[in-house]
Every structure is written in C-alpha cells, then in structure tokens.
Amino acid sequence: MDKKFYIAANWKMNASLSFINDYFSFLDSNAENSNEMIICPPDIYLESVKKTAPNFIKTGAQNISSNNTGAYTGECSGEMLADNSVQYVIIGHSERRQYHQESNEDIKLKLLKAIDSDINPILCIGESKEERESDQTFDVIDKQIRSVLDSDILSKDIGLLIAYEPIWAIGTGLTATPEMANDVHLFIHSMLSEMTSMSIPIIYGGSMKESNAKELLEMEHIHGGLIGCASLDASEFLNIYNIAEEIRNG
C-alpha cells in the first residue's frame, strides 16, 4: 500500500527520566523507519527525548502559546519550542478544549504561531457523544475546520496533519468502528480537497491500540494515529508502528 503513516505518541502528563531511557532503549533496537514516528512528551522532557530518541524519531509538543512573549505564566512560545528542535505540535486537543476552554479562535492563533515557528501543526478535531447521537458530527467538524483553516493558511506548505479524535471514544472504553472512523475521515478528506490542492494526511485519535490498529490503518482514508494511553507502553506503541510498517511495505 503506497500510503505513508504518521504514528504519534501523546504522553500527556506522564513520563520520567528513567521512563524515557527505558522507552528509547527498547525502541532503538527494535524499530523500523519507513513511516513517521512522532513522540510528544511533556515540555519539561523535550530535550531529554531529543537526546535519547533514535534519530528517525520526530519530537512534538503538546501545546503552544498563542503569544510570542510576555507575562503568560506556564506558557511556552513557538520560538521556545523551535529552540528545542520541536518538529510537531498538537493543537486543539479535546482536553485543551474542555479543561482550558480553548475556542476555535484560540486554536487558529496557536496554529499561526506554529506556522511562524516552522513547526508542523497536528490539528485535532472531533465531536462529543451528544453531538454524535444528535447527528451533528459533520456539522461540528465542518465548523472546526473552517474556523481554523483559511485559504491563506492552506496555500502554504506547513506540514499540517489533521487528527480526528471522537471525544466520546477517548478514555471511555468506547471505540469507533473502522468503518465509522473512515467515514468521518472521508468527509474531512473531501472537505479539504475542496479547500486546497495539497494532500493533507488525516490520522485517527480515538483510542487506537494494538488490538484495533490493523483494522483502522487498513482503512483507505486513515493515515496514522495520535495515540494516548497505548503509547506509554513502548512495546505496544512499537507494535502499532510495526503494523503500519507491514501495511505499507507488505
């Protein structure tokens, strides 16, 4: 299958120095690298990950400030992330939207800061359980995309990834079927095709794990995964990555 996969680990607020050393000791001796592997640790560990990870692994941040500098306690600017050789940044994750009340307008500002800093954005979008049950999935996603991505942004080669994360399938034990996920990815793909001629990979962020990765990644419009809990186990994360390798090279 001639499709490049992007397998991204979102460690959220987890990890330690010993965890990082053990994690990459395991990956270094076991991983292939024809697809993109991205590790997004807490900011405090970005430098440690960069120093410890095999060279083929890309580093990503979990957030970026919408400001360049100033009295914004706890924030980290795009310039600071770039100084740490960060290559990707997660923007608009459902937990940021929920716990930090980030709006689509906030998310667009953050995406622009990532672009200014030459950091590839991973833009997260997705619907809640209530929105899915009331058949609003496509309306919600349409609004999230159009509120953030305009023609000027889409005219630039910014290395954008879209991560579809159905909120109802994150940390709940619920998972979208591969067909359900692919249908939404197809909608996003069709929508983006009308907005830009560039090909934008769309990855799945709804509790991908080793047991469902093959079925999901074999779907035509799923180009990888943004993986939370399962990425904290180096063996499971590597197995997911290797599934992507087998699909691409098999």
Where is each model-derived feature located?
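Active-site loop-to-helix "anion-binding N-cap" substructures in soluble metabolic enzymes
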Residues: 1-250
